[in-house]
Amino acid sequence: MGVSNRLAWGCPTKEHLLPHFLEHLGNNHLDIGVGTGFYLTHVPESSLISLMDLNEASLNAASTRAGESKIKHKISHDVFDPYPAALHGQFDSISMFYLLHCLPGNISTKSCVIRNAAQALTDDGTLYGATILGDGVVHNSFGQKLMRIYNQKGIFSNTKDSEEGLTHILSEHFENVKTKVQGTVVMFSASGKNSIQPQHVLA
């Protein structure tokens, strides 16, 4: 991750992504799309962390790396589906680091992912993260090669993802939206969630 962030995407982890992760971290936090669990190794011991991923192996690996004592819940769930009612209004912060560019479809089809996450936030909670852009940025040769391979294999679906498109879907569900592009990565935060009509699902 560190090599590609620095050399392919122009957004070094320790200089940009990790500070962004820690800046918005709340006491009761949900990390969606857990990856390797790298960011979780840096959270304070006092933090309550819950994990969400469709892949149970990823949940277990990230939990082990972060330290089981920090992990409150491990939730296997499809982010395109509404969350169980028990999760609504529960979290001070929710992170999505390198999740959105891996989800199928264009940026507008990912709006429901933002909506579902917003339901799980407290009224003053913050949704934040980072995603690799395909549109409106200039990729270097290494980045172009990875973009081509990953999109062809279905690992990424982000050739048309833009900062403007991301801002739009965040603004559909939040009053306060901030974005910052570093290299070909956009870091974002969103708070002041709009009123959302609940969708009823089985817990």
Task: Describe the function of each predicted region.
Residues 7-27, 38:
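Conserved alpha-helix/loop element of class I SAM-dependent methyltransferases that forms part
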Residues 28-84:
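Class I SAM-dependent methyltransferase SAM/SAH-binding core
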Residues 95-98:
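A conserved beta-strand element that flanks and buttresses the S-adenosyl-L-methionine
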Residues 121-127:
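Short glycine-dipeptide loop
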Residues 128-179:
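C-terminal alpha-helical "lid/dimerization" subdomain adjacent to the S-adenosyl-L-methionine
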Residues 173-203:
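Core SAM-dependent methyltransferase catalytic element
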